[in-house]
Amino acid sequence: MQFFNLNAGEWAGALEEIQQKAGYRFNDLGRLRLALTHSSYASENPSSPEWNERLEFLGDAVLELLVSRRLFDALPDVQEGTLTRNRSALVDEHANAGYARTLGLDRAILLGKSECRDGGRKRDSLLGDAFEAFLGAVYLDGGIEAAERVLAPLLPPVKDVSDNASKANPKGALQ
């Protein structure tokens, strides 16, 4: 199997590192592999007919739920609009790409040759999608509690998020 910029041993090491950083060991490594398989890789490798977009769909919902619950519990006196802005700051493309980099997903995602050449490993949109797929895989493998344990250490303190959301929307902070 060709991994484009990674040999099989390096990829196995990257998967191990991801699990260590996430504090979660997959029961089914196939889920982790699928979460890290980009459509460009699958289209070039008939032995990998599936890619991570369905897991991305699921992971997006899991991420929104967990972040919403965290904000709801931590900010009991805050109105819905502010909660929504805070959630948006925690689940946007840039934030998700940061979580992906923290876990080392950028080193392990399987990309097609052209996507790899074009810098896909550095692109926030691709990495953010990979993080959502990863979280979806954790959810399927270990449940919502496992997904929450993986996500919690990646998120900044709620106060920091709330302060930054107010600065980004000063008119809303005054209302």
Predicted regions and their residues:
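Double-stranded RNA-binding/processing signature
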Residues: 1-175
